Amino acid sequence: MYPTSAPIEHALLIAVDWRSPARGADRAESGAKRPLWSIEDALEELARLAETAGIEVVGAVTQKMSRPEPGSYVGRGKLTEIRELKDDLGYDLVIADEELTPNQQRGLEEALGVKVLDRTALILDIFAQRAQTREGRLQVEVALLEYRLPRMTRMWTHLSRQTGGSGSGGGGGAAGTGGGVGLRGPGETQIEIDRRRARDRIATLKTDLRKVHDQRELYRERRRGHEVPIVAIVGYTNAGKSTLLNALTDADKLAEDKLFATLDPTTRRVRLPSGRDILVTDTVGFINNLPTTLVAAFRSTLEEINEADIVLHVLDITHANAAEQSQATLQVLDELGVSDRPTITALNKIDLFDDGVVPAELAKDLELPDDFLPISAETQVGFDALLARIELILDRELVPVSVSVPYAQNALVDLFRREGRVEGVDYNEYGTAISGQLPPRLLARFRPYITAKSKHPQALLEPA
């Protein structure tokens, strides 16, 4: 009988603890970024990532150092300790909590005789498993190849063996290619051929991605033509974003309790209490130290956030590292240039508190904005307040305006009623005269029909 699935890998997690404040100066000199997380929290998240990738974690080893060893990540004594644990724990895979240099990865594999992955490779592997759309798969392959390119060494087997799928071999090291440690791959000439093939493949993929991006931009243009406000749900992975979108739209799609359950953006229509429609988009979850290759590769997908009128930041208030998760999310939003967008901070899973109220001390510790909203995507507690807040923000942006719309342009009258606030209507021989308020994004559509009664300067401005 043939096996129907790949054998489960057993991983030992390793991490260098340079989180001590006393070592901050050393880290600053080396240009490294001090993490916000404790070593225990970082390893707990790494274990969750491994579990999501289908890997069983059998143990963890840490070492306090001012900086990782350049050739082996951990020190010589710790390396011996890790090697001696192999028989006791039965691990066949080692996962490092940070992104390893090619020298560190190679040094660990040669010393331990097992495949070695780092945090970046693990996340890339999860993305490779979960990408559903053509765009998502293209983005993941670009990120994988760009990660692997500098790691092609004398022990690198032929690229054609790598492109059929990643499995858990995202690290790209010798032991992860199927050749095994000690089995030399091609010579230097073949390595150069492989590198050129990888660069050519990346160029081809990026060309394909540009075409997909152009198609997405056409979709966005059509969506803009309908002038429906957009709310982008953002937040740390597994914060409950997909559950929230499903609850808002009465969808019965299963929201998995796994990291990175959503990679491809999902957009659905939601009706506000006033009858106004909005589009709500669920985006890929963020994570601490999200690999730069993934941020770059998924930039076109993350552009959905740039299109949003409102950013809805969902935070798992019950998580022990809620503050760190919030900061990681805000950092990515800042990198995307949307940190100044109107933002609602929704504290999810409030139903897990006995009285359904966020403790004042916790809110203070998290340095939350004063106008945060407690909600439960599971029980829909706080949804009325959430929808009202969205409506309030949309109304706050409205511009007073008076227009006279020809009868032949009645679709604009419907648009005004649907997306604006009508305060007065009069019908005359020229058309429909409306006074009220409109969102700024609609002013260009109505500018030919704006009358002198419009006192607000933004309404009277000529287009640039």
Range-by-range predicted roles:
Residues 111-164, 168, 179, 340-344, ...:
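Canonical P-loop GTPase G-domain recognition
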Residues 31-38, 67-72, 130-135, 190, ...:
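Flexible beta-alpha connector loops of hexameric P-loop NTPases
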Residues 35-54, 83-88, 97-114, 274-277, ...:
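Conserved C-terminal guanine-recognition region of P-loop GTPase G domains, centered on the G4
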Residues 2-11, 22, 165-296, 302-310:
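Conserved G1/Walker A P-loop phosphate-binding module
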Residues 13-17, 60-63, 95-97, 313-316, ...:
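Conserved beta-strand segments of the P-loop GTPase G domain that flank and frequently precede/overlap
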Residues 17-21, 65-67, 99-102, 121-124, ...:
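Conserved nucleotide-binding/hydrolysis micro-motifs of P-loop NTPases
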Residues 392-442:
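Long, well-ordered amphipathic alpha-helical subdomains in the mid-to-C-terminal portions
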Residues 1-125, 454-464:
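N-terminal accessory targeting/assembly segments
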